[in-house]
Amino acid sequence: GTIINHLFFEAKVSQAEVAQIGQYAENVFFGKPCGLMDQTASAVGNLVTIDFFDKENPVIEPVDFDLASCGHALCIIDSGADHADLTDEYAAIPGEIKAVAAYFGKEVLTQIDEKDFYAKLPEIRKTCGDRAVMRCIHFYQENARVPQQVAALREGNFDKFLSLVKQSGYSSYMYLQNVIPAGYKAHQDVAVALGLAEHYL
């Protein structure tokens, strides 16, 4: 999207619009119920913080930080996992979180105070199920963690940033449950890759 924007539109399309176009292509053309986070990060590049409270007008703020200056590099590992047949698994994540929001008569979880969520936990478990509850716990914790991560980078406290990122990873694994697809026993490629990375690093 960014390349096409520069080649054919004189870079006049905003980064948010490039991300929204990418999301539309995935949702409509490829039939994948994705959000805007990956598309926004790709459109902007480098490190960014994104506020999706207004999904039509996300607030995108670059975070000026050089990983190399701390002796680190961001690496992508080929775990061998194939998510071609996991559309329903990925769709279940926002679907279950929105189901909890709907319990409160709202569209998205950001419209519900965390205290109200925990106050109604027994009823939510009965209505929406435990996995939905766990995913909402991740949602609230992660939304609290992100500003701390950004602040740590801006303060130059890279060790604190890494610690918070590690917490995010564990939360994704434990609460969001996006590492091992439901029912997969023999093939858990991403989990194996995470285990080996933790062992060697």
Which stretches of residues belong to each language-model region?
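C-terminal nucleotide
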Residues: 49-201
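Gly/Ser-rich oxyanion-binding loop with an adjacent helix/lid
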Residues: 1-67, 199
